[in-house]
């Protein structure tokens, strides 16, 4: 019997996503034994500083990639929004699974919407993208850093440290916590991180056998959307921890991509969008990025 080992972070959401991939692989490849290799990453362990301060969301990948290089794992499963814009050699992404809900969620025990929050309410998020959109909608709010896995963040809310927090809808839904969503923060008024809600599977590009096993999980329509979003981010010279948002959707046989660059300090937002071919997501991403640059995005990004 062939065995495939999946490197994964230890958080409940990471384990859910990895088991979801494992179940899909078992269904596609009867007789394949799939096992999880849970690992702790520096991004999970250092919670008293922002991700940007300790090296960015790529920290969630490094230990998993090292496990693949050592031969301790065959592949790794990631939230695609945490994957750096460029992968180190020899790594590739043979599978992007069908996307979940890309929207953000307002979570509160007392208030049913962003508009219902009282003046000066304390809202928890460490995401500059979320902070920028919160400041644009409600400049009176007190925004407070909040890190940790989904359950840790919910516990901090429940302990009274915040009036509300902002999380990804997909993470809550995957953990069976749909009832915690007070309000969806949705397009076009509110845009998610590039590739939010999508799960990516990474392996070594020089391992043809593993690549072939994983490629059957690839969802082409999701891949086109998230590749356009990430192409826009790359063209902006962005990363996983800048106030950049993007969302692509299918319209007929092509894609419609919306992009945003914001300022977490004063809530200024710049938007641009374009239609394009799903066969040239790089071009679509570049055109939306250029639209943002034409409206002053470079100045906002330079102020970071």
UniProtKB/Swiss-Prot annotation:
Needed co-factor(s): dipyrromethane
InterPro entries: HemC, Porphobilin_deaminase_cofac_BS, Porphobilin_deaminase_N, Porphobilinogen_deaminase_C, Porphobilinogen_deaminase_C_sf
Cofactor details (free text): Binds 1 dipyrromethane group covalently.
A molecular function GO annotation: hydroxymethylbilane synthase activity
Modified residues (S-(dipyrrolylmethanemethyl)cysteine): 240
Alphabetical keyword list: Porphyrin biosynthesis, Transferase
Enzyme class: transferase
Function: Tetrapolymerization of the monopyrrole PBG into the hydroxymethylbilane pre-uroporphyrinogen in several discrete steps.
Additional notes on this entry: The porphobilinogen subunits are added to the dipyrromethane group.
Descriptive protein name: Porphobilinogen deaminase
Lineage: Bacteria, Pseudomonadati, Pseudomonadota, Gammaproteobacteria, Lysobacterales
